[in-house]
Amino acid sequence: VFAGLVLIGSIALFSGKKLDNEKIMKRYYKVYEPPTSQRSAQSGMDADFTLALEFYNTRDYEKAAILFNKVLESKPNDMQTVLLKGVSNFEEKKYPEAKQSFGEVIDDKDNLYIDQAQWYLALCYLNTNEKEKAKQIFNVIGKEGGIYQNEAKKIIRGLK
């Protein structure tokens, strides 16, 4: 009987931690919506980007990531495409690839997508049970401001 109670207690303890992360994801996660103004399809790269966006918008994230990757071969510094590739990989639960993309956007330091990259990177860390790394990024978001500041502050309070 004691062993059974210990087992049940252990399961509750470990699943409780995971459930907290799941609650956070359920409450605060929304897939990134790219700006509605799309590039004109004048070149092959823009046609690939437009098709990748179509896959992304229809939630075919695997095909979207492949095409975003193709776009990045000829335009590696396009941070919007890097972010979209990251979110596509995030949706496919390919967290190492997603983390790499979000880190690249953040490290670039000169683009309009840093807020989103920080947010999704922190969520990646939650999904891979790297709670301390997630907290660090949520703290940065909470202090620096930006579009996710309020959500980050609420999550920090919930993680303590």
Question: What function would you assign to each model-found segment?
Answer:
Residues 42, 76, 110-112, 146:
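Short coil turns that delineate tetratricopeptide repeat
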